[in-house]
């Protein structure tokens, strides 16, 4: 049955066509076939050499409409900073007790923040957090003394992005239930940040291709040049 549903909605998408951003997001919401609230994911292939240290593309942005889901936040902090994190709405705050829980297999959270003085403690679980993209990092604002602000930003739906070894940025930008207009706004915010993050040493075409898809739906290609121009970030 799932195969039949996919085949039925896939007919609505011309796999050879590159759509406008507006067309693409209307299509991706229309062609999300599952009964559950599917995630909407984008993949942007960049014309960079990810092996070069000066051609890394990464950053963090606040999406205008959040991610359409509850974000569970863990904070490694002590004393006044522990209280600050709790007041801001952190789901779990601690130190060695959190390390013990994580070492025991507990990973029921989406984001991890730490104060700088706690990084020696966090390093004990680096091999667990790192491969899952959960390791606190000062470059994306998750190693900070401003834990209250960081928790608030994560709860609102801050998106961390980075290029992978294949030169592609993969990102989830929301849920089907948010509707095409809000998803489009979130995408344009991400795209603008990626355009601004173009490495100075990158030569040739920067945005090579863009595709968007729901969890169970077909991929929809987006015309990259027009989309980038619409961000006003060139």
UniProtKB/Swiss-Prot annotation:
Subunit composition and interactions: Part of the 50S ribosomal subunit.
CDD domains, per database record: Ribosomal_L1 (cd00403)
GO cellular component: cytosolic large ribosomal subunit
GO MF annotation terms: rRNA binding; structural constituent of ribosome; tRNA binding
Pfam families: Ribosomal_L1 (PF00687)
Family to which this protein belongs: Belongs to the universal ribosomal protein uL1 family.
Protein name: Large ribosomal subunit protein uL1
The species this protein was found in: Bdellovibrio bacteriovorus (strain ATCC 15356 / DSM 50701 / NCIMB 9529 / HD100)
Domain of life: Bacteria
GO biological process terms held by the UniProt record: regulation of translation; translation
Disulfide bonds: none
Reported function: Binds directly to 23S rRNA. The L1 stalk is quite mobile in the ribosome, and is involved in E site tRNA release. Protein L1 is also a translational repressor protein, it controls the translation of the L11 operon by binding to its mRNA.
Keywords recorded for this protein, A-Z: Repressor, Ribonucleoprotein, Ribosomal protein, RNA-binding, rRNA-binding, Translation regulation, tRNA-binding
Family annotation (InterPro entries): Ribosom_uL1_bac-type (IPR005878), Ribosomal_uL1 (IPR002143), Ribosomal_uL1-like (IPR023674), Ribosomal_uL1/biogenesis (IPR028364), Ribosomal_uL1_3-a/b-sand (IPR016095), Ribosomal_uL1_CS (IPR023673)
Keyword Methyltransferase: no
NCBIfam families the record matches: rplA_bact (TIGR01169)
Record Gene3D superfamilies: 3.30.190.20, 3.40.50.790
């Amino acid at each position: 049955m799932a195969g039949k549903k996919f085949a039925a909605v896939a007919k609505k998408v011309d796999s050879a066509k590159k759509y406008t951003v507006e067309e693409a997001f209307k299509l991706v919401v229309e062609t999300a076939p599952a009964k559950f609230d599917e995630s909407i994911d984008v993949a942007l292939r960049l014309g960079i050499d990810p092996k070069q240290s000066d051609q890394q593309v990464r950053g963090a942005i606040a999406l205008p409409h959040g991610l359409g889901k509850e974000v569970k936040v863990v904070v490694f902090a002590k004393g006044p900073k522990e209280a600050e994190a709790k007041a801001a709405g952190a789901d779990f705050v601690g130190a060695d007790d959190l390390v013990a829980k994580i070492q025991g297999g507990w990973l029921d959270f989406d984001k991890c923040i730490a104060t700088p003085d706690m990084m020696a403690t966090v390093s004990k679980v680096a091999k667990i957090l790192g491969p899952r993209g959960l390791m606190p990092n000062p470059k994306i604002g998750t190693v900070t003394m401003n834990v209250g602000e960081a928790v608030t930003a994560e709860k609102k739906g801050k998106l961390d992005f980075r290029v992978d070894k294949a030169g592609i940025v993969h990102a989830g930008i929301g849920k089907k239930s948010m509707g095409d207009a809000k998803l489009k706004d979130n995408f344009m915010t991400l795209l603008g940040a990626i355009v601004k993050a173009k490495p100075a040493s990158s030569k040739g075409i920067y945005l090579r291709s863009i595709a968007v898809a729901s969890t169970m739906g077909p991929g929809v290609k987006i015309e990259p040049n027009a989309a980038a121009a619409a961000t006003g970030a060139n």
